[in-house]
Structure formats: C-alpha cells, structure tokens
Design a protein with these regions (language model features):
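Conserved active-site segments centered on acidic
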Residues: 1-61, 127-135
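Phosphate-binding/catalytic loops
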Residues: 64, 70-135
Length: 135
C-alpha cells in the first residue's frame, strides 16, 4: 500500500520500497487471499511478491524499517543485532499518532480494519518523509 501511495503522489523515483518477513513462517508465500481480495475491492494494484526473510543487511541498507506489531519490532531488533542505534525501526501506527499494533487479520478475520490501519500508517509515514525530505 505504501508503494501505491508513493506512486499516486508521483514520488516513485524518490523511494526504494521492499517487504520482508520477521519470521520464517511465510517465507516464499504470496500475500493472503483476504489481503488480495481487499486490495482488489479498493482498486489498489497488487505488486506480485513472495515473502523473504529480513536480514541484518536490511538495517544497513534502508532508512526505515517498519513493523506491524510489537512482535515484529522485537524480531526486527533481534535480526539487526539487538539494538536500533540509528533509530530506523518503527511500528507502522506510530505514524498515525496511535502507536498501537495493526489489527492482524490472521486472528481477527477483519481485513477492513487492517486495511484502515495500514492506510493510516502508510499515509502518515509518507507525510513524515515528504516533510523531512522536502519532496
């Protein structure tokens, strides 16, 4: 969804966006069918991808590492060596002013709530970057 927002804003040339899992459970899997369905209903194009494992190199390479929930943040910190010295690791909803965990549709079955959470967080993140980078 962040890629979609960046593209809609005409800012794709300013970003390199990637996605990675913090656990091995979903490695190699495509997005969940419920996610795919919700994106189609919202007319947001799906970018084909399969889950890959986050690595310590991601911390060195990317400016922002965004997790959906507290468990993601804990796993990301572990993967990157146990600390976040450069303050690159964030919970997505921090950018919406909430800081709570994204509602996980795996447990809730509520893809609409998750969509709203992710859209709010991604919109806030894009606003922050645009403001800080003057783009």
């Amino acid at each position: 969804m962040f890629t979609y927002l960046v593209t809609q804003a005409g800012l794709a040339s300013h970003f390199e966006i990637n996605s990675a899992a913090t656990s091995r459970e979903e490695i190699g899997n495509p997005p969940h069918y419920g996610t795919v369905d919700k994106l189609h209903r919202e007319h947001i194009p799906l970018i084909p991808h399969h889950a890959r494992q986050m690595t310590a190199e991601d911390y060195r390479y990317y400016d922002y590492l965004i997790g959906m929930d507290t468990a993601n943040i804990r796993n990301m910190t572990r993967i990157t060596g146990g600390s976040d010295k450069e303050q690159k690791i964030f919970k997505l909803l921090t950018f919406s002013g909430s800081g709570r965990d994204v509602a996980d549709p795996w447990y809730t079955g509520d893809f609409d709530a998750t969509f709203a959470d992710v859209m709010a967080g991604c919109s806030g993140l894009l606003e922050k970057i645009r403001r800080e980078e003057n783009i």
